[in-house]
């Protein structure tokens, strides 16, 4: 019983961090994978889709063939279905060949539908197939095929060189004959194998011999089949022409040929027998011919959280009865979730004192610039009139945090006498709600989708004034003249008029995958998933060089204000580094306790958000951690600051607003139904983007959500100007007006946008597709 609880706890812990290689849940090794699926709609155009899943693969194969090994595979996005993972034993097998196999099997499934419409004695099915890229391994990532596991005797009925099984059944042979006749002798489907009439791993021969992999033998394959095939009663039943008689135009079959040939055109197969329009090596999809080629890895983890919760749910069911889990909303069930009638309690953010010089490694001595004001931060006790906060213990059922309230202790007092009191409302499971005004403390706001409850305003200036007037508090505040990493380039958008409806792609710069980006008028700097910093010429629009910076993926990169040649990077290797770009050398290095997802600089303060659920405040003069802000229940994905306020967004769907003078929480913004991936503060407004496919706009004067913008996909990154809102929403670059929030433009970039950076009227978008796209628009 104790072991099962441990397994469930391990699964819960993994919800708050990137899923690492070879973690063990209930005795099973698990890892992340990109899952690629091919679908064919009624328009007969193939379309690739992908998601990140959690998989468990048995090391020892349960079957071996001449070309591949078969392993039991568990995909936690389909926890009730057993799968087979197929790995090629040929070292020369390419990544594209796995996608070609999936295309052939999906293509044959379309032919099987037509075969079944003819009402044969036994219908047939080609198993759905997938491609899994195991992304927790060093590049190039291992790849395997996947399909459902079917119990029974596996048999090969024929192959691509004319072989026919001695106990050949009628149905598989007639299907090969059917494909040959119904395509007007343009193609032939062979290598029929599987369990009963569930088929897999087919091969397609085309008349020209082009496309569909190296197994396509062209007319040689036709000849071998014709030599060995013997028509059977199913062939007669389907009224197929006897095999060795010439037939060119007239088909006696009962199925329409035109629709199938339209499908051939959709994938590039010419009806005149000239074969595929492109030699099928996935370039067809890469060039946009009917579908999007899976050319990039998407580091987003849309379904991982839900899958890991399934793991935990299984373990809880085995151990003891437990209340049903409320699943993390995903892109499939947005706006359908119902809030629980009785919200559970949740820990209140607390300050954890962590003075630490030991985790800072000095690479080379650097003299900080002289400042008039002393901003050295000291670790001190919070003033006695600060709030005292009590938090309930977290439990394994605390999964849905949308309506969790923060419990305040009865002996709470006001943060400071000058701060405005804010009402905290809590709703009971019956109907009536009561609100009480306390001077105490952190508040929890219930933000409804349509009508947020009124709150008293947050006043950054008041908080700053109170901090300066409170002599007993030694916690410094940001300087009055604030310089942040969000505002380094002078912004002309306040003075110019832009026509954002005219936005267009003006260039694509090849070079490096980009998860994050920053820059200035001369250079751009991007961070990639292989730990390299990409340096780009922002004027000539070309890739300059790469710098090996981290052992794992770089999650954030920003310029240090006031230091033209210094940038900071943060990575999945738990390191934050400051670099001199001229020398390409590390100046300082911070070792965090967990993966660092986001960093932000304001004045001489560095804020880091990590997978350990905390936000840390660092003095950049001494690189000491002067404050740790705790309270989120899952990984921090975004932080930003404005004046004396700090904002943090998390996988727990919450946005916390912190008072930097005291390190206490002023309020938490609720309403998102997915991970909060990006925050942007602009003109006393906070813009938040989430995996629930929405952007929410929060008025910091009233603490209300004043608008919710529905996007096309999960929102990964935002950039806000005086004239427009730019959002990276899946594969889409979307632009919204700043005043009415109207959708001005939506452009498909064919690769998920992970980062944005703007220089005047040029926008740069980065993805994992090894390029930067450059966008521009007209001035009015």
From Swiss-Prot:
Any GO BP annotation: mitotic cytokinesis
Segments annotated as WD repeats: 507-546, 549-589, 591-628, 631-668, 671-708, 748-780
Keywords: ATP-binding, Cytoplasm, Kinase, Membrane, Nucleotide-binding, Phosphoprotein, Repeat, Serine/threonine-protein kinase, Transferase, WD repeat
Protein's UniProt keywords contain Kinase: yes
Region described as Disordered: spans on this chain: 310-495
Record's subcellular location: Cytoplasm, Cell cortex; Membrane; Cleavage furrow
Domain Alpha-type protein kinase: 40-243
Stretches with biased composition (Polar residues): 353-376, 437-450
Cysteine pairings via disulfide bonds: none
CDD domains named among the record's database cross-references: Alpha_kinase_MHCK_like, WD40
Induction remarks: Down-regulated by growth on bacteria.
GO MF terms, alphabetically ordered: ATP binding; myosin heavy chain kinase activity; myosin II binding; protein serine/threonine kinase activity
Any single Gene Ontology cellular-component annotation: actomyosin contractile ring
Post-translational changes noted in the entry: Autophosphorylated in vitro.
Composition bias, Low complexity: 337-350, 380-436, 458-488
Knockout mutant characteristics: Null cells exhibit excessive aggregation of myosin II filaments in the cleavage furrows and in the posteriors of the daughter cells once cleavage is complete. The cleavage process is slowed down for cells where the gene is disrupted. Myosin II overassembly increases incrementally in the mutants, with the mhkA, mhkB, mhkC triple mutant showing severe myosin II overassembly and myosin II phosphorylation is highly reduced. Overexpression results in multinucleation of cells.
Reaction(s) catalysed by this chain's protein: L-threonyl-[myosin heavy-chain] + ATP = O-phospho-L-threonyl-[myosin heavy-chain] + ADP + H(+)
Family to which this protein belongs: Belongs to the protein kinase superfamily. Alpha-type protein kinase family. ALPK subfamily.
Assembly notes: Interacts with myosin II heavy chain (mhcA).
Known role: Phosphorylates threonine at 'Thr-1823', 'Thr-1833' and 'Thr-2029' in the C-terminal tail region of myosin II heavy chain (mhcA). This phosphorylation is critical in actin-activated ATPase activity of the myosin and regulating the assembly and disassembly of myosin II filament. In vitro, catalytic domain phosphorylates mhcA, myelin basic protein, myosin regulatory light chain, casein and caldesmon. Drives the disassembly of myosin II filaments for efficient cytokinesis and recycling of myosin II that occurs during late cytokinesis. Can be activated in vitro by autophosphorylation.
Protein name per Swiss-Prot or TrEMBL: Myosin heavy chain kinase C
